[in-house]
C-alpha cells in the first residue's frame, strides 16, 4: 500500500463500489458487477446511478428523503466488501425502477423484493452512501482515513443525544415519491442485516422546486439562500486532492428540534429579528431582494 492510494485502489481494498467517504464517488470500480451497456438515454424520472460523482449531492433536490445511519457488527472486511457489491447491484436496479432482484416463483421462501414500490416509476431516485471515522477503525483501515474526517467540536447550546450520534455508515435515498425512497433503503438494509443494524433514521420532505426557487422551512423562512451553485458549488463541494477521495465529498447530518408551537406565538417582527431577514421576500433586514448584501449592523 502506498502512502497516497488511488481511489481505485481504495475501492478495490475496501469494496466500496458506489460509496466513498461520506460521500465518495460512483465511478465503476474493478471487481464490481458490470452493468449492461446503455443503449438508450435514461428513462423519464430516472437519474443514472453511475457518474463522475455520486448522485444525490448536487442533483436538483427531490421532494422526499429517507436518511439512515447504521452500525456495523462485523469487522470482516471481505463480508463488508460483499455487502457493498450487493448494494451496488441493488442500487443500480432500484434507480431504474426495478426490483433489487427478480422475483422467484418459489412460494415457500420470502420474496426477493419487499414490493411496496411495484408499478411505481423511479421518481428520480438517487442513492448516496457514506462512511464515518469509526468505519475505518472497525475495519482496521485507519491509514486510509483522511485527516479532515474527524469528530465535530462542541458547539454552543448543543444537546446531543447518544442514540442519534455517531454510526459507521449512512444511506441517503432521495426521490419525488416517499414510498420509493423508503422502499430503497428498506431493501438495502434488509439484504445487509447480517452485517449491520440501523442506528437511527429520518424522513423529510420539500415541496419547492430548488432549481428555480429557494425552499422554505417549517418556520416559513427561505432556507438555502446562501447555497453555492455552478462553478462555485464544484469548488466547495468536491474534494480535489491526490488521494482516493478525489471527486468525493463530506457530509454532516444533524437533527434539529424545531419548537413550532412556540414559534407560532412569536410576533412577525421578532421572527424577522431572529433570522435577520424578511419572511415574505427572504431579503436581509433593510433590503428588498433575497440576494442583496447583508448589513450585519441591522441584525
Describe each region flagged by the PLM.
Residues 9, 13-23, 33-299:
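Long, histidine/aromatic-enriched segments associated with O2/redox biology
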Residues 1-6:
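N-terminal secretory signal peptides
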Residues 29-31:
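Boundary at the C-terminal end of the N-terminal hydrophobic targeting segment
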Amino acid at each position: 500500500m502506498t502512502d497516497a492510494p488511488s481511489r481505485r485502489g481504495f475501492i478495490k481494498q475496501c469494496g466500496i463500489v458506489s460509496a466513498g467517504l461520506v460521500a465518495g464517488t460512483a465511478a465503476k470500480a474493478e471487481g464490481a458487477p458490470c452493468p449492461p451497456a446503455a443503449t438508450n438515454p435514461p428513462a423519464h424520472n430516472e437519474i443514472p446511478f453511475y457518474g463522475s460523482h455520486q448522485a444525490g449531492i448536487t442533483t436538483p433536490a427531490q421532494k422526499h428523503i429517507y436518511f439512515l445511519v447504521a452500525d456495523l457488527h462485523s469487522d470482516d472486511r471481505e463480508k463488508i466488501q460483499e455487502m457493498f457489491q450487493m448494494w451496488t447491484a441493488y442500487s443500480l436496479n432500484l434507480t431504474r425502477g426495478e426490483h433489487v432482484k427478480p422475483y422467484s416463483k418459489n412460494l415457500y421462501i420470502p420474496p426477493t423484493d419487499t414490493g411496496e414500490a411495484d408499478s411505481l416509476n423511479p421518481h428520480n431516485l438517487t442513492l448516496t452512501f457514506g462512511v464515518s471515522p469509526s468505519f475505518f477503525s472497525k475495519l482496521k483501515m485507519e491509514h486510509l482515513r483522511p485527516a479532515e474526517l474527524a469528530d465535530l467540536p462542541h458547539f454552543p447550546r448543543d444537546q446531543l443525544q447518544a442514540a442519534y450520534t455517531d454510526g459507521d455508515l449512512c444511506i441517503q435515498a432521495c426521490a419525488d415519491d416517499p414510498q420509493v425512497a423508503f422502499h430503497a433503503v428498506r431493501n438495502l438494509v434488509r439484504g445487509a442485516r447480517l452485517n449491520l443494524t440501523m442506528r437511527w433514521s429520518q424522513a423529510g420532505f420539500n415541496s419547492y422546486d430548488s432549481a428555480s426557487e429557494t425552499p422554505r422551512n417549517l418556520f416559513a423562512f427561505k432556507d438555502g439562500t446562501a447555497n453555492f451553485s455552478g462553478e462555485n458549488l464544484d469548488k466547495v463541494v468536491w474534494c480535489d486532492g491526490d488521494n482516493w477521495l478525489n471527486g468525493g465529498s463530506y457530509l454532516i447530518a444533524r437533527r434539529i428540534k424545531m419548537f413550532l408551537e412556540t414559534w407560532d406565538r412569536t410576533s412577525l417582527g421578532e421572527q424577522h429579528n431572529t433570522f435577520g431577514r424578511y419572511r415574505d421576500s427572504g431579503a436581509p433586514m433593510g433590503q428588498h431582494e433575497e440576494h442583496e448584501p447583508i448589513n450585519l449592523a441591522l441584525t
